[in-house]
């Protein structure tokens, strides 16, 4: 039976206005829209009155419910029938954890009520198209139609393909029908294999073969034999990449054989809880570094949010599934798309060439895709610290005549670093009889054929197959699985995981054969043991779907009880679906139909399938000299600063959590003005050391339109000039991931790919001492479509994205572009040696040109010398600022340094040649360094010792004030105010934020950037930062116990435990499942902290599901009430813990006036480094800190304080319960965005009880308790940041 329950309004006023504006622009007479959530409960038994009231209370969250009866035509948008939304999974979990076992499933839709004039059927279709994502949602016209969401279908049996009867044609037909993308020789191979087996193949076997042997999974082109211009080539592409490892194997622990590569890390104190006692402690051991970079291009073109989200999720799983289990740590993301053409902000170089119907626009991709990638990382609890963004779409001359080159098929890059124990780097042995396990969520009928689909050029496959190949994301589920993996690796030698892989392309049909084959075994499986929420799925759909957040593992049979215990505690679903066999054979039994859908020798599936040969011709690029007429430097500056590749990226940065883990030493945002210009990302290796890890990106894809090899060399060079900004030491410590994107088969591109791989793998990297132990290729970077009567193609440039990773010697010595105005000198190190090439530059692009000669690595020895020299200067502390030269050239390098330093520039480019345009806008490799004037001679001497004397040019100095002036020989070349440049540079991000977020907030932020008087972040402390008020109590040896409380989806508990640990507490890991099961109680604890994250993925309101699981369980409710009423206890709630505890007001004495925390005014997750003031309040944790103003990490989507009315707010204030407020950089309490990131009235962001024993706050003090983890800080701070005082106050209060 289904019950329908109304929910809160689903759209804010500005979202409704945006929708109405879109309808008006489409000339649709829609006058008014009201939207509210509707909940559907699928019940297995009726609810009594109390249970019904409980369900209603559970589903009451967010803004107040509307009291009026909605007017207008109903359009009900729900998840597609046959799928289960992540919302449903988590909401159902909450209902069950609150004791409502009669609820089979909860699902949610949005009821739109449309008031409109007379609309035709076609116009109504336009309206519905605006209101739902056809890839994930459907539209009903009555609430009762939602019954279809819970319809159960009968299982369907496997289908046989009549090869023996119909011969080869049966395989050809199946290939087309199922979208298998099989090549002719693969069809021959299968015909031969099944003829020898004497039986017909089943559809599931063909599908499994297609996925396992797709280009996406098998990398056939990189393993192919090559004939170029009639000449046999000696090596495959992959062998040339492997040559870098053969030449420089130093520091690499695992390459080419696992889900990620591993290199040596540092010996540090890894901090985690003991399995038996739950007590957190440091464990001195090597934290080796793993690295991986994936792409998820095809799904992102079809449906950007889930495409980018599952791209990030898949890469995170790759990291977690390395060795015998590892810990993902920090991420990077990148996008290459065609021109944005922002409505009302179209740029002169942006022409509309059309696109295929089934893919979305570049603007849609950059509106939704980054949000999807960020949301997954945020909810999983991984900071996203690095990235790139390129737009390119142009008609260019080539040997094929004029052709369209650009990124209609986008690049969506997802990568990152993690850590792994030394003993777990290599996978274990799979014993015969080992249990084969799927860890994670249920099988769903989604993501079918993603491996094969992504191996085709967009436009080749059927639209329904594109539709089927898009996946769905549930990061909170992946977090639960990762917690299980963490518990396993933390057991050391007792780790129950023998072997682990993630489930990606091809689903279990690829993952399970790979698992057993890599372990030297076969496998025997039972189809019906696979967790599935859709009983009507066919065997093919169950085995081959790409439902996300799943891992496959081999676990020794005797370790299964331990594994079961860990999964139950973390509430991570798992299923044992088979066992390993001695015979290298794959069999899949179907208990329902008592048949064998799969019965194959493994070598048929994974054996020597036909090897590809690429027989190709070289076509040299055809460039035209840059036409200069009409180009002025002033116009060029404005255009280049508007090019998205160059322009400010704030709209891509602040949506991503950059402080979670408490181990982020360098994020994108630099300095007191928080400008997104960092050279590289840096994390600390642990919570107790200054060793670390660095990541940087390099890519120069447009150059490939002129010179394939130069483009590849520049990508390596740029990654190197970016990562050089931190203290690494020997260049052999740097390891690279190479992600290759090409339109294989396009005339000239294959030979160009070979040329590029050879340039990097055989020549440049070996000469530099660099290794490429990991990478990925995507060989179908082309879209085809019909535009009117014309066939069109959009082909991406050959695109190599290099991600560089390294161990860092001391994270404190990371140099940023932030300029100082002390007596200084700016030096340009020009590795272009005066070539100043303008081909394929940002300058050329903004004038719709390509040019002829591009930049290149001019001298490999000098590039190596450059890296060594910068490392020497970093170690000697000689550099004040550093920024590499890249897109936009020297002009942009200097401008970004000035923005970060909020200062002027007095530059002289007389020594850079007579061509001023080329001097300012060439994109040859190099960097600008700032040194003290007194150090200039010594610095130039170091550079000369490294062979760079002829590359060094004095180009002026940073000065106080707002003028940005470039001269040559006494003549002004360019002069403008820095503020004006800053505003131009920011206009793209402003326009994107206006489109995507609350436009009022976007306007406020943009306006703030034009204020030259802004003093930036600053600190005013009312206490001695170096005083340890806890020291006398720690000296007694007594360590009070603090319960570090987490719920499923919480992700900030480890850094919270570490902060309390440092203050003299015994931090104990307590999961809500421990309390609900009675394994742990709160009676032994002196303090309790509820940690941040996304409990239940913020479903049913941020923190509200967590709170209700306490309130609706009598025993646990009593336990919390007793704790809060007990004198001599302290409690802290941070972020999600704050939201949760604000919903426990009925249990916490003195909290009656506490507010609720609701959606930010921006309607967006906000990750900021915000200034707050400690106000006079009873809070025991903030004693002695009143009046202090200091920055703190903020990361939340629902942090805005909501009070009932003005009287409620006045009472909260008059009682003195407000503990922290947001202030602007002038020290004034503020409601203005982004200084106040959530729009809370009077800047309120923390409150306390009348006794001061319980304090809740939205910002994250635990993430910045170490100075080194602050995005910016005064130079005189030591190891401890000022927020460490909160934790020491806690220890002091407990005596």
From Swiss-Prot:
The active site is at 1135 (nucleophile), 1260, 1262. It is found in: Cytoplasm. Mg(2+) binds at residues 718, 722, 884. Pathway: Purine metabolism; IMP biosynthesis via de novo pathway; 5-amino-1-(5-phospho-D-ribosyl)imidazole from N(2)-formyl-N(1)-(5-phospho-D-ribosyl)glycinamide: step 1/2. PROSITE patterns: GATASE_TYPE_1. Phosphoribosylformylglycinamidine synthase involved in the purines biosynthetic pathway. Catalyzes the ATP-dependent conversion of formylglycinamide ribonucleotide (FGAR) and glutamine to yield formylglycinamidine ribonucleotide (FGAM) and glutamate. This is Phosphoribosylformylglycinamidine synthase. The lineage of its organism: Bacteria, Pseudomonadati, Pseudomonadota, Gammaproteobacteria, Enterobacterales.
């Amino acid at each position: 039976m289904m019950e329908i329950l109304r929910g809160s309004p689903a759209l804010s006023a500005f979202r409704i206005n945006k929708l109405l504006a879109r309808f008006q622009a489409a000339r649709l007479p829609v006058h008014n829209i009201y939207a509210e959530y509707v909940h559907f409960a699928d019940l297995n038994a009726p609810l009594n009155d109390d249970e019904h009231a409980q369900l209603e209370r559970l589903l009451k969250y967010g803004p107040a419910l509307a009291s009026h009866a909605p007017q207008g035509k109903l359009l009900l948008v729900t998840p597609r029938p046959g799928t289960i939304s992540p919302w449903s999974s988590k909401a159902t979990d909450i209902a069950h954890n609150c004791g409502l076992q009669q609820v089979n499933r909860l699902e949610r839709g949005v009821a739109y009520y449309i008031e409109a004039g007379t609309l035709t059927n076609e116009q109504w279709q336009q309206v519905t198209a605006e209101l739902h994502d056809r890839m994930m949602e459907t539209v009903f016209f009555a609430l009762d139609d939602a019954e279809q969401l819970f319809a159960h279908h009968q299982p369907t049996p496997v289908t046989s393909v009549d090869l023996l009867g119909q011969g080869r044609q049966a395989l050809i037909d199946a290939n087309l029908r199922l979208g298998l993308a099989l090549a002719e020789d693969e069809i021959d191979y299968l015909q031969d294999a099944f003829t020898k087996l004497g039986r017909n193949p089943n559809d599931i076997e063909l599908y499994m073969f297609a996925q396992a042997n797709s280009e996406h999974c098998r990398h056939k082109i990189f393993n192919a034999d090559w004939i170029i211009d009639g000449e046999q080539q000696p090596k495959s592409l992959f062998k040339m990449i492997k040559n870098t490892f053969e030449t420089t194997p130093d520091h690499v622990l695992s390459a080419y054989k696992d889900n990620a590569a591993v290199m040596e890390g540092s010996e540090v104190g890894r901090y985690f809880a003991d399995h038996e006692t739950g007590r957190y402690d440091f464990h001195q051991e090597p934290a080796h570094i793993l690295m991986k970079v994936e792409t998820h291009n095809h799904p992102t073109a079809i449906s950007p949010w889930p495409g980018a989200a599952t791209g990030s999720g898949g890469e995170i799983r790759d990291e977690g599934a390395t060795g015998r289990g590892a810990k993902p740590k920090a991420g990077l993301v990148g996008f290459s798309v065609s021109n944005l053409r922002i409505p009302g902000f179209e740029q002169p170089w942006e022409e509309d060439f059309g696109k295929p119907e089934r893919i979305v626009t570049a603007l849609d991709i950059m509106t939704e895709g980054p949000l999807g990638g960020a949301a997954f990382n945020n909810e999983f609890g991984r900071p996203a610290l690095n990235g790139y963004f390129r737009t390119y779409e142009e008609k260019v001359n080539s040997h094929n005549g004029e052709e369209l080159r650009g990124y209609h098929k986008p690049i969506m890059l997802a990568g990152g670093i993690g850590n792994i124990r030394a003993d777990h780097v290599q996978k274990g042995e799979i014993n015969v009889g080992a249990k084969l396990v799927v860890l994670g969520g249920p099988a769903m009928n989604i993501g079918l054929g993603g491996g094969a689909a992504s191996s085709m050029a967009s436009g080749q496959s059927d639209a329904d197959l594109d539709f089927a190949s898009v996946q769905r994301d549930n990061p909170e589920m992946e977090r639960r699985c990762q917690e299980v993996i963490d518990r396993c690796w933390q057991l050391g030698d007792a780790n129950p995981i023998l072997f682990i892989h993630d489930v990606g392309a091809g689903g279990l049909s690829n993952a399970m054969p790979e698992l057993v084959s890599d372990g030297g075994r076969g496998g025997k499986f039972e189809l019906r043991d696979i967790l599935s929420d859709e009983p009507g799925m066919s065997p093919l759909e169950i085995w081959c779907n790409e439902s996300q957040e799943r891992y496959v593992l081999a676990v020794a049979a005797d370790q299964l009880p331990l594994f079961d215990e860990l999964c139950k505690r973390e509430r991570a679903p798992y299923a044992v679906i088979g066992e390993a066999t001695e015979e290298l054979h794959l069999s899949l039994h179907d208990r329902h139909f008592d048949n064998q859908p799969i019965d194959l020798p493994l070598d048929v599936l994974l054996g020597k399938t036909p090897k590809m040969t690429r027989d190709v011709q070289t076509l040299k690029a055809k460039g035209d000299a840059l036409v200069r007429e009409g180009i002025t430097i002033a116009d060029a500056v404005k255009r280049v600063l508007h090019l998205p590749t160059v322009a400010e990226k704030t709209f891509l940065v602040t949506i991503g959590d950059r402080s979670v883990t408490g181990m982020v030493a360098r994020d994108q945002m630099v300095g007191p003005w928080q400008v997104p210009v960092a050279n590289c990302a840096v994390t600390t290796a642990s919570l107790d050391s200054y060793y670390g890890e660095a990541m940087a990106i390099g890519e120069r894809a447009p150059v490939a339109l002129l010179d394939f090899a130069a483009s590849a060399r520049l990508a390596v060079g740029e990654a190197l000039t970016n990562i050089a900004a931190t203290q690494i030491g020997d260049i052999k410590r740097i390891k690279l991931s190479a992600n290759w994107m090409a339109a294989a088969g396009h005339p000239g591109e294959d030979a160009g790919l070979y040329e590029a791989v050879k340039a990097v793998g055989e020549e440049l990297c070996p000469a530099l001492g660099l290794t490429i132990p990991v990478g990925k290729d995507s060989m179908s970077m082309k879209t085809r479509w019909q535009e009117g009567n014309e066939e069109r193609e959009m082909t991406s440039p050959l695109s190599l994205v290099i991600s560089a990773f390294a161990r860092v010697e001391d994270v404190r010595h990371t140099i940023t572009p932030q300029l100082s105005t002390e007596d200084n000198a700016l030096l340009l190190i020009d590795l272009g040696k005066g070539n100043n090439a303008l081909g394929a530059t940002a300058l050329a692009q903004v004038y719709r040109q390509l040019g002829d000669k591009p930049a290149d690595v001019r001298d490999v020895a000098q590039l190596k010398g450059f890296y060594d020299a910068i490392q020497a200067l970093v170690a000697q502390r000689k550099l004040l600022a550093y920024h590499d030269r890249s897109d936009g050239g020297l002009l942009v390098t200097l401008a970004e340094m000035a923005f970060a330093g909020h200062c002027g520039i007095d530059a002289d480019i007389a020594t850079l040649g007579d061509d001023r345009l080329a001097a300012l806008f060439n994109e040859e490799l190099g960097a600008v360094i700032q040194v003290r004037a007194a150090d200039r001679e010594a610095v130039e001497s170091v550079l000369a010792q490294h062979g760079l004397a002829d590359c060094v040019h004095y180009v002026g100095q940073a000065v106080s004030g707002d003028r940005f002036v470039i001269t040559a020989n006494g003549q002004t070349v360019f002069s403008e105010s820095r503020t004006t440049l800053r505003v131009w540079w920011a206009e793209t991000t402003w326009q994107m934020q206006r489109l995507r977020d609350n436009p009022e907030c976007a306007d406020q932020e943009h306006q703030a950037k034009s204020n030259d008087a802004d003093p930036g972040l600053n600190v005013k402390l009312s206490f001695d930062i170096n005083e340890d008020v806890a020291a006398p109590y720690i000296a007694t040896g007594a360590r009070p116990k603090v319960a570090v409380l987490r719920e499923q989806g919480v992700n900030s508990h480890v850094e919270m435990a570490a902060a309390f640990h440092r203050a003299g507490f015994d931090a104990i890991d307590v999961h809500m499942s421990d309390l609900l099961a009675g394994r742990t109680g709160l009676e032994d604890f002196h303090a309790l902290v509820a940690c941040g994250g996304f409990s239940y993925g913020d479903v049913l309101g941020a923190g509200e599901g967590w709170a209700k699981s306490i309130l609706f369980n009598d025993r646990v409710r009593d336990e919390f009430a007793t704790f809060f009423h007990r004198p001599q206890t302290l409690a802290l709630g941070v972020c999600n813990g704050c939201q949760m505890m604000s919903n426990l007001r009925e249990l916490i004495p003195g909290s009656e006036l506490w507010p609720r925390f609701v959606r930010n005014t921006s309607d967006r997750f906000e990750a900021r480094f915000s200034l707050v003031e400690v106000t006079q309040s009873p809070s025991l944790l903030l004693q002695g800190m009143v009046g202090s103003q200091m920055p703190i990490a903020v990361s939340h989507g629902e942090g805005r304080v909501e009070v009932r009315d003005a009287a409620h707010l006045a009472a909260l204030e008059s009682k003195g319960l407000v503990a922290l407020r947001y202030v602007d950089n002038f020290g004034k309490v503020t409601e203005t965005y982004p200084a106040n990131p959530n729009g809370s009235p009077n800047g309120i962001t923390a409150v306390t009880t009348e006794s001061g024993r319980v304090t809740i706050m939205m910002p994250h003090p635990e993430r910045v308790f170490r100075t080194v983890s602050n995005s910016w800080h005064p130079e005189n701070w030591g190891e401890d940041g000022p927020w460490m005082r909160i934790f020491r106050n806690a220890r002091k209060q407990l005596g």
